[in-house]
Amino acid sequence: MIYTNSDGGARGNPGPGAIGIIIRKDGKILVKYSLMIGSYVTNNIAEYEALIKALQLASEHTKEVTCILDSELVVKQLLGEYKVRNPRLLELFLKVQKEQEKFDVVRYKCVSRENKFQQIADELLNEELEKHGFKKKVFR
């Protein structure tokens, strides 16, 4: 079984956005991936973009995948528990459905940000943002 942990974030929401992804099997990380995705995106758009890329990367390794995210909105939309009302999110939702066709089985799971693998994906996206000059704001 292959597991993906994906995370997307935007500084400013909306603002500059990036994604971070890990692909793992048998407790070992096979792939670490991060990418800057735009200068004006929302957190929800970034979460969907991260999942789409995670599915693309996982399809190179398996036909059965469990996708783990910390976005309750995205997971519940994919499970049909929430409607997709935002036109941009609907476009991304449909892209996810298209990517799912590459698999025999796709499962979705929402976890806390404190999940150790989710934290790695989060670190990857934050490193990507910082590499492009978008520093975290520190509140004092």
Where is each model-derived feature located?
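RNase H catalytic domain
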Residues: 5, 9-15, 52-124, 129, ...
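Short, conserved alpha-helix that lines the donor NDP-sugar binding/gating region
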Residues: 47, 51
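Extended, charge-rich low-complexity interaction segments
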Residues: 133-140
